[in-house]
Amino acid sequence: GPLTEDMSMVERIEFVKGPAGFMLANGDPSGFYNVVTKKPSGRNKGEVGISMGSFDLYRANLDLDGKFSEDGKLLYRINVMGQLKGSHRQFDFNNRYSVVPVLKYLIDDKTSVTLEYTHQFSEVNVIGSNYIFSKKGYADLPRDFTTAEANLAPTKMNDRSLLVIFDHKLSNNWKITAQAAYFNYQQQGASLWPQWPVAFDPQNDSILYRGMSIWDVLGTSKIGQMFVNGEVQTGAVSHKILAGMDMSNKEYYHDWNQGGALGGEFNIYAPEYGNATQPVFDRTKSIRERGVRYYDGYTGLYVQDELGFFDDALRLTLAGRYTTLKTGDIYSGDFKSSRFTPRIGLSYSIDKNTAVYFVKDESFLENYGSDWQQKSFDPITGGNIEAGIKKDWVNGKWNSAVSVYQITRNNVLTADMDHPNPAGGYYSRQSGQQKTKGVEVDIRGQIVRGLDVIINYAYTEAKVTKDSEKGNIGTQVPGSSRHIQNAWLNYKIDMGALTGFGISAGYQYQVKRSPWFVFDGSENSLPDYFRLDGSLSYQKEKIGFNLVVNNILNKYLYSGAPYEDYFYWQTEPGTNMRFSVSYRF
């Protein structure tokens, strides 16, 4: 759903790239990540945790896992979380709770049905209150600055979903899986943004004119997937086959058509809160009556065969997907398009510790919205070419991976600077191509007993290669960084009086960062980014303690972009901490 999954319900997060990207999915050429939620394990166990921290953070979570029936056929798992959380920004908060019950029924030793329900609720300050605006440039105001007021009505979000999974083992080598999901998202709130077309007083850069508009949303999604996978042998060649179909239908209603000024003049350098008059919104009609309807959907057929040669030392993957996309709204009408996208991959195990691979993949994705003439946008097309090598060292204590890639995206949307949108900002236009070339290096291993390290480096050259505005060609793609380097050290004592004690530290370093959105032919690079974090932990049998400290150096960290004739950015908190206690039973 639109709300990010709370970590209390997450088992693990899988970052999918390289040969692993050959999955039954309508995916982006740059890869994707997969969130795996907690499922019943068949064991009776549980965990409870309590956290407190900076900015009035209070949080509790409960994880229960077990069997409903004595024969072990009916399993359950339930995760419950509640959180009250302030912010480093004035008047800002994020209060939320989630309830995630899961049932799994083992019909027999070959068949199972899983039913998962998720309800997440979030209450935050008015949307947009986390942005800072100034005509003088980035970091011109304190990181706790806000344009919001203390008495604004909160924005409330309810995100509900129901997932059903059916698994059946056809034989020892073949399996069929069917999944169906329904998502329902409801939001009632408002958005805070500078007024348009005049955000700042032309005679005084200190005076900002704030605007506030309604932002109510109703979204429903129906998603289905069915596939079969298995293995066969034809002579000396093995085959790992995956074939299936997936489809979705999504419908959204948005209301942002009511709004007005939030108070009068607002001095960003000497703000006075509590005197602003708020616009009043009319919600007597349902969101379906007053909102604008958008919909999109797709149907895809997919087949893949991984052929293994020389006892599977050499693996050739051939795959193809046929996708039909459909989108529509009252402005641009209905749009439908179909395309076949092939995939090919080759990997070879040089020895038991070393493997090389090559991947060529194409993509076909919907493009939402319309231009100033209400013409629908063509789908995004593109492709990924990637090659790499993976190797284990020192009997598996160290492993490394190096890859090079080029990602191409066509029909990219950019701002149409010739056609302002009366509702604010600019219309979009479809005129671009972006190419991203890069190198990624991942290293992890054990330095000495108990001391582990993870090191990542990524060099990314992301450029605009085609654009109707010639001045944009050759500029860095908005929102990208040329260099990103991370490292994380973790030391855990496993003997002696201090057994169970651990200490960790790590950093992230970004160089030559591009702003979120730049459309004027320049790059307007953001300053380099460096953040240092650390933690202390102690595990004693069933009870654990953990202290996390973020932004240890208390740096003013932010990201942003130029907009109209001013700048806007989001800040990260200064040094902050979180202390957690957990108990397993």
Per-region residue spans from a language model:
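Membrane-embedded beta-barrel scaffold of Gram-negative outer-membrane proteins
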Residues: 167-181, 185-191, 381-446, 452-465
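C-terminal beta-signal and adjacent terminal beta-strands/loops
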Residues: 508-518, 537-585
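Acidic/polar loop-and-plug regions of large Gram-negative outer-membrane beta-barrel proteins
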Residues: 83, 87, 100-169, 184-219, ...
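Structural signature of Gram-negative outer-membrane beta-barrels, strongest in the C-terminal barrel
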Residues: 106-108, 219-221, 238-242, 246-250, ...
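Outer-membrane beta-barrel translocator/receptor signature
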Residues: 8-11, 22-99, 107-111, 160, ...
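Gram-negative outer-membrane beta-barrel transporters
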Residues: 429-517, 553, 580-584
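Surface-exposed extracellular loop regions of Gram-negative outer-membrane beta-barrel proteins
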Residues: 123-136, 251, 334, 347-429, ...
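Face-selective signature of the C-terminal outer-membrane beta-barrel domain
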Residues: 162-185, 210-330
